[in-house]
Amino acid sequence: MASSSATLSLCSTFSAHCNVNSRRSSTILCSLSKPSLNLAKPLTGFLSPSTASTSRTAFTVAPKFAESVVEAEPETTDIEAVVVSDVSEVTEEKAKREEIFAVIMVGGRQYIVFPGRYLYTQRLKDANVDDQIVLNKVLLVGTKTHTYIGKPVVTNATVHAVVESQGLNDKVVVFKYKPKKKYRRNIGHRQPNTRIRITGITGYEEYPASPNVAVGEVNL
């Protein structure tokens, strides 16, 4: 009985060993039949967790650009300060130029002129470009302290100007129409003009002036 039990145990262990070996051989055959895939290395086209983390860190580093922009802000403020100073200088120059003005008549029309400004008038005959002209019909001259009112003109007062160009005004369309006559006319006209620049106002000092009076002090 002891010998038979020993033989049975040996057979059982031998069969188990055979089953294990058969399983191992089947796994080896399967591994040989299927291509080996290394899970440690990621396939091309897919991101591993390490690369995804590095890409995320790259995006977090992007705010450095915003830091550089913040550092450049003081330069823009300096530029704005320079522009403001230039504007103040221009306003001071305009104030100096507009200390005096005059009202003149050219071609039956009245114009308010300031030294340094340009003006479009009707075509001045026999006037070429860069010619210096003198306008004698001065109706009024005004300064900060006095006003010279002409009766009808301010005697000895003259306005000096320079001819800059001879041109044409914008086109004016003239349309003619007659009902039930099939009459239509569309005509365009451009009036010739002259551009002059005022250089100075002189000769008004000898004319009797009236002091400037505030509106509240006028006696009616």
From Swiss-Prot:
GO cellular component: chloroplast; chloroplast envelope; chloroplast stroma; nucleus; ribonucleoprotein complex; ribosome
Protein name: Large ribosomal subunit protein bL21c
Keyword Transcription regulation set for record: no
Subcellular location: Plastid, Chloroplast
Assembly description: Part of the 50S ribosomal subunit.
MF GO annotations: mRNA binding; rRNA binding; structural constituent of ribosome
Function, as annotated: This protein binds to 23S ribosomal RNA in the presence of protein L20.
Database matches in InterPro entries: bL21-like, bL21-like_sf, Ribosomal_bL21, Ribosomal_bL21_CS
SUPFAM superfamilies assigned to the protein according to its UniProt record, in alphabetical order: L21p-like (SSF141091)
GO process annotations (BP): chloroplast organization; embryo development ending in seed dormancy; thylakoid membrane organization; translation
Alphabetized Pfam families for the sequence: Ribosomal_L21p
Keyword Transcription: no
Key words, A-Z: Chloroplast, Plastid, Ribonucleoprotein, Ribosomal protein, RNA-binding, rRNA-binding, Transit peptide
Superkingdom of the source species: Eukaryota
Protein family per UniProt: Belongs to the bacterial ribosomal protein bL21 family.
Origin species: Arabidopsis thaliana
